[in-house]
Amino acid sequence: MRIVALEGIDGSGVSTHSRLLHARLAGAGVKSCLWKEPTEGPVGRLIRGFLRSTEGVDSDLMALLFAADRLWGLRLGVVERCGGSPEVLVVDRYKYSSLAYQGVGSGLEWVDAVNRKAPEAEILVYIDVPTEVALRRITARERREVFETPEFLERVKSMYEEVLRLARARGVKVIRVEGVRGGVERGIEDVQGEIAERVFEALGLARA
């Protein structure tokens, strides 16, 4: 199973582009499955409750919960939902989100350690958008989550740079895609076209 993880700060379009990439892969005849974190499993439901809370969230606790939810997904959830092991698993956030988000409060080294049982992705697509753009998109939503504040997202964005360096050092193919170019937001089709082309190439597949 080849893991393709899509990452970025909240408001960067990770969920949208995960769904579209999966559709392109499936349309090309690839046995692809779309997976989202937090999952719909028992631990994932607990995490979602914390994320919607107006109270503070303990970073260490969240790191452990996300790690447990991730292993549940990899060992049980994916097989059940995907009808076996897919050729390509497109993940709407993976352990790199934990390293970036919980790494801010708990330290990158410790969060990395509790996620060692989760294999590295083959490809990590990082959708890079300025924090102010992400916040504008978040503000347009009906509901915000506990992590979606300007100060915190700035720290997460900085932490992602460390996470990307770590992933590269471990042999992960990192694909950085700009969501904004020349000060102008790129359209969804434009961004997705670049993501699909570069992912297909990295996987050794015919052009999307």
UniProtKB/Swiss-Prot annotation:
Span list, region Defective ATP-binding: 8-15
KW Coiled coil (keyword) present: no
Entry's Gene Ontology molecular function annotations: ATP binding; dTMP kinase activity
Pfam families on file: Thymidylate_kin
Top-level lineage group: Archaea
Keyword set, alphabetical order: ATP-binding, Kinase, Nucleotide biosynthesis, Nucleotide-binding, Transferase
GO terms under biological process: dTDP biosynthetic process; dTTP biosynthetic process; dUDP biosynthetic process
Uppermost EC category: transferase
Gene Ontology cellular component annotations, sorted alphabetically: cytoplasm
InterPro entries in UniProt: P-loop_NTPase (IPR027417), Thymidylate_kin-like_dom (IPR039430), Thymidylate_kin_CS (IPR018095), Thymidylate_kinase (IPR018094)
EC number: 2.7.4.9
Reaction(s) this enzyme catalyzes, per UniProt: dTMP + ATP = dTDP + ADP
NCBIfam families named among the record's database cross-references: DTMP_kinase (TIGR00041)
Assigned protein family: Belongs to the thymidylate kinase family.
Protein's recorded name: Putative thymidylate kinase
Species the sequence originates in: Aeropyrum pernix (strain ATCC 700893 / DSM 11879 / JCM 9820 / NBRC 100138 / K1)
